[in-house]
Amino acid sequence: MNKQELQLKANEVRKGIVTAVHAAKAGHPGGSLSAADIFTYLYFEELNIDPKDPKKPDRDRFVLSKGHTAPGLYSALALRGYFPVEDLRTLRHLGSYLQGHPDMKHIPGVDMSSGSLGQGISAAVGMALSAKLSGDDYRVYTLLGDGEIQEGQVWEAAMFAGFRKLDNLVVIVDNNGLQIDGPVDQVCSPYPINEKFKAFNFHVVDLADGNDMDQIAAAFAEARNTKGQPTAIIAHTVKGKGVSFMENQVGWHGKAPNDEEYAIAMEDLKKEGEALCQK
């Protein structure tokens, strides 16, 4: 896909996020929207996957370590063809397979159940090690939140990955600067993030604008060309990206829009999509 096509797809992913969270009357829109461009690039450009064969042995693996942003993952999976887009409206509903956090046993395309912060990266490291030991070529990607990396387990996993030189592993940090309790650097600062990963023998890519498709593409290309080290992509993003009243507002970390707010959000995204079509 070209840049415009990816941008339009990201716009659709955002619409799916807002629709799902509104229908659920609960969920985490802010961090889902900040990572929407990354979800889009992964599922429509980067990952070796097949929606018709979700468990094919040589597929690339993706672990959403910040599992509360499941609406972003679900929207990307639906648009990629893993399940009907209409099912996004059943998010968190009784009897729905689209739970509040990813469930590998019930959701096509989900490689790891997640939600307990810090555990997803550990699972991803195990997958990457398994591929190395088995001589398999698949790659493993995991997306973390910047608040999540306050968890000690993250750094145990990073230490092991760097020590084992797992160059088939890509760790992405969604550095939107906000977590549920406020600005990350005021709650419990993990900065400088880049230097911490470098200390554990990671190749680090500082992604200045994690909502820009050209920069995202360049970051993943650099990761793919890195040998002998795992890669950490530190993606500087905007919490709530794409919805005017949600951008950089910590209150939208874990709150659903009401009917009026939903209409405004969808109008914002409609206008963005129309503007992209005119480019």
Where in the sequence are the language-model features?
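Non-catalytic, mobile gating and regulatory segments of ester bond hydrolases
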Residues: M1-E5
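N-terminal capping segment at the start of a domain
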Residues: K9-A26, D174-N176
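Cofactor-binding active-site loop characterized by glycine-rich and histidine/acidic residues
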Residues: I17-V21, S32-F163
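Glycine-rich beta-alpha junction loops
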Residues: H68-T69, L73, N176-G177, T237-G240
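Short acidic, glycine/serine/threonine-rich loops at helix termini
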Residues: Y74-S75, D103, Q153-W155, D181-D185, ...
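Short secondary-structure boundary/capping segments
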Residues: R80, V187, E247-G251
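Thiamine diphosphate
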Residues: G109, S113-S116, I121-N225
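Glycine/aspartate-rich loop-and-adjacent alpha/beta segment that forms the canonical ThDP
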Residues: M213-K279
